[in-house]
Amino acid sequence: MKTIIVFLSFLVLVLATKFGDANEGVNREQTKEVIQNEFRGDFLNEMAAMSLLQQLEAIESALLEKEADRNSRQKRCNGNNVPCGPDHPPCCSGLSCEETFGYGWWYKSPYCVRPSKG
C-alpha cells in the first residue's frame, strides 16, 4: 500500500511538472509582453516627465528674470550740491542741474541744486 502511495505521489509530481512546463512558454510570452509594455509606458512617462520638467524650468527662469527686474535698484542719482552733466549721473527728483556762481572759472561742471524760485 505504501508503495502505491509513493508511486502515485511520484506520478502526480511528474505530471504537474510536465503540464507546468507546457504553460511556462505561454507565461514567458505573456511576461515578455507585460515587461515590454511597462518599459514602453515607462519610456513614454519619462518623456512626458522630461517635457514637463523643461516647461517648468522655462517658467522658473522667466519668473526669476521678472523678480530680478523687480528687485533691481534704480540708477543712482546725484544729491544736492553734487556735480552733474553729461559725464555724471542725473540729479535726483526735486533737483535740477544748474550752472551756479563760479561756474566756468571755479567749477568745471554744473551742480545739482534745488530749483530757484522766480
UniProtKB/Swiss-Prot annotation:
Listed GO CC annotations: extracellular region
Alphabetized GO MF terms: sodium channel inhibitor activity; toxin activity
Disulfide bonds: C77-C92, C84-C97, C91-C112
InterPro entries: Toxin_22
Subcellular location: Secreted
Leader peptide range in chain numbering: 1-16
UniProt entry keywords in alphabetical sequence: Disulfide bond, Ion channel impairing toxin, Knottin, Secreted, Signal, Toxin
Matching Pfam families: Toxin_22 (PF08092)
Expression (tissue specificity): Expressed by the venom gland.
Propeptide stretch(es), residue numbers: 17-76
Biological role stated in the UniProt entry: Ion channel inhibitor.
The family this protein is said to belong to: Belongs to the neurotoxin 14 (magi-1) family. 06 (ICK-Trit) subfamily.
Record remark: domains: The presence of a 'disulfide through disulfide knot' structurally defines this protein as a knottin.
Name under which the protein is recorded: U16-barytoxin-Tl1e
